[in-house]
């Protein structure tokens, strides 16, 4: 499991508190579906995903992105227990949804890009390293039931 120092935890928590979590989640999920189109197969019920514009404007993508972001918020509040925080979601994604765990890493990387775009110069290389470490921890926790 990934270990974040007190300084890294502070950076992650502080940066997450500066963004509109719902907007960041919606943009990250939308970008995931555009950049990695094979991930769309898990969202058949979302309607029109035929183009970047359709995806980014899709209300179901935005709503699910909000859920994803709220889940990230839960993880940020529990950085010392990511495995426990994501145990039920890991089970759901593994046993029922059959999501390839690599998709969690992809989403984490896209989230880092969205954070960088949103925060600009405030998202320093040091802050990025801390945030990248956090999303890796979340992805690892979500993939736990796959092992």
Swiss-Prot record:
The modification S-nitrosocysteine is found at residue 94. The modification N-acetylvaline is found at residue 2. GO terms for molecular function: haptoglobin binding; heme binding; hemoglobin alpha binding; metal ion binding; organic acid binding; oxygen binding; oxygen carrier activity; peroxidase activity. Red blood cells. GO terms for biological process: hydrogen peroxide catabolic process. The modification Phosphothreonine is found at residue 13. The modification Phosphoserine is found at residue 45. This is Hemoglobin subunit beta. It comes from Scapanus orarius (Coast mole). The lineage of its organism: Eukaryota, Metazoa, Chordata, Craniata, Vertebrata.
